[in-house]
Every structure is written in C-alpha cells, then in structure tokens.
Amino acid sequence: MSLSVILRCEFPRVAAAIALIGWSLAGHISHAASGPEAAGKVDRLLDASGMAHTVRQILPGMLEGINSPQPGVPANVRGALSDAATQAFQPGPMMEKVRARMSSALNDRQIGDTLGWLDSPLGSRITAAENEASEPAALGRIEAYAKELERRPPAKQRANLIGELNRATGSGELTASMLEAGVLASALGVNAAQPAQQRVPGDVLQKQVKASLPHLRQQAGQMVTLGLHYSYRAFTDKEIESYLNFLKSPSGVAYSKAAVSAFRDAMLDAMGRFMQAIPKALDKHKGVTGA
C-alpha cells in the first residue's frame, strides 16, 4: 500500500476517531499523591472524570475508522491495520500509563477539588455528556448536528465559550499531536513492511507526512470544535461558564494539564506498538482479497 493512499484515504477516517477521543478530554505539579488511599482516589478520579470511559473507546473508535471501506484501500491492508490496532490499543496497558501519570502529577488537594466538581450535579451531567460524545456511535449524530449548525449557526457568545473550552481543556492541541503521531506511525509501519527496494527513505517519508498534516490538522480542528458544540448542546451558557470557572481554577488547571499529558503519553506508547505491529500484520494478511 503506497504512502499516498494511507494519507489520502485511510487517515481521514482514523482522524475522525482520534478527534472523537480528543475533544472528550479535559486537561503545576506539586507533591504527588501516594499510598493506597491516594491510589483509590486516582482510580475514582479516572472513573468520575470519564477518562477511563474514553480510554475504553479508543480501540473501538480506531477500528471503526480503519474498517470503513475506502476507495483504493485493499481489504488486506484494512485487516492488517485492524489487527495491529487491536494489539496496540488495548485499554489495560493504556490505563496503567494514564494512572501512573495522574498519580505523579496531582496532589491530594488537587484530586479532592477535582472530585468535588465532578461529583456535583452539573459536573456529573457534563461528564455523562462527554462520555456519550466520545463513543464511536456518536459520530453519526455529530455529523447530523453539523447540518443543524449550518442551518442555525451558534450565537457569538456560545462560539466564544466553546473556543474557551477548547483552549482550557487542550482538546485541539492534543488531537493535533495525536493525529501527527498516528499518521507517522502508520506510514512508518507500512513502509517497513515493503520490500527493501520499494521502501521510501526515512527523511523523504517524514517530509511527505509533514506535507499532509496541515490539511488533516485543519480537518481535525474543525471536528474538535464541532464535537465540543455537540457535547455541550444541552447546557446553558451559564453552565458552561461554571465549567470554565473550575477549569481555570488552580486545581482545574492542574487536572487539565495532567489529563492531557497522561493521555498523550498513553497514546504515544500505543502508537509505537501500532507501528511495530503493522509489518507482521501486513505479512499475515498477504493475499487476502475483497473490497
């Protein structure tokens, strides 16, 4: 499979899955939380915040993007990428990475303040909405909501609040970095599986990937903004302002930064496993035919 096909056909769908994940995450490190009680609080934080739910949606989201038939993408390549993703994006190892980073980044007070917000009626409603939006099944509903926004664009105040949420949670930047890592991992993995005489030199490959990124980053950025509008569509401006007040508080800032860093670490680890698994998976699927 050529690099151009990967970049043109396959990754726009996977970019949708990555954006779906990225916008659902909210992202000063002091004395780290430690001990059994602190570990229990971190686990509760991961559940109450929806981070654990989001991590569990990564593999289904990746598979939905990969397995959607695309012109020019052979069935054997989709099968190989699906196998590699299944190996790489298992939730268990990813959760261990997230848990370790969150435990080292947040102190007891920051965890307590964050749980206080998450356990509030508004915090619980927001988490439920974010969880729903992070599931692969939501993609069709989000696309339908995009048409609704075309007919009735959001008010300026709502658009400004969504922009603030994007910046406060780090959703857009996280999605962009994940997308770049994902494109490069797949390109390197597929390239490594080619016969030696057909492989693209590493520096040329990276230049080709870099050239493809502006369009994909723009696409992902638009999807993140749309996803945020969809996620918070049932909330008033005042409720979103309350959410922003938490995110801008010292503990909210610490939580958001820790969440983004933890998720980025887990995704980069998984992308590395994905890249390493692709050549063997492609070899396994050689000769498979189909659309």
Regions of interest found by a model, annotated:
Residues 135-233:
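Extended amphipathic alpha-helical interaction segments
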Residues 56-92:
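N-terminal, post-signal-peptide region of Sec/Tat-exported proteins
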Residues 2-16:
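Bacterial N-terminal signal peptides that target proteins for export
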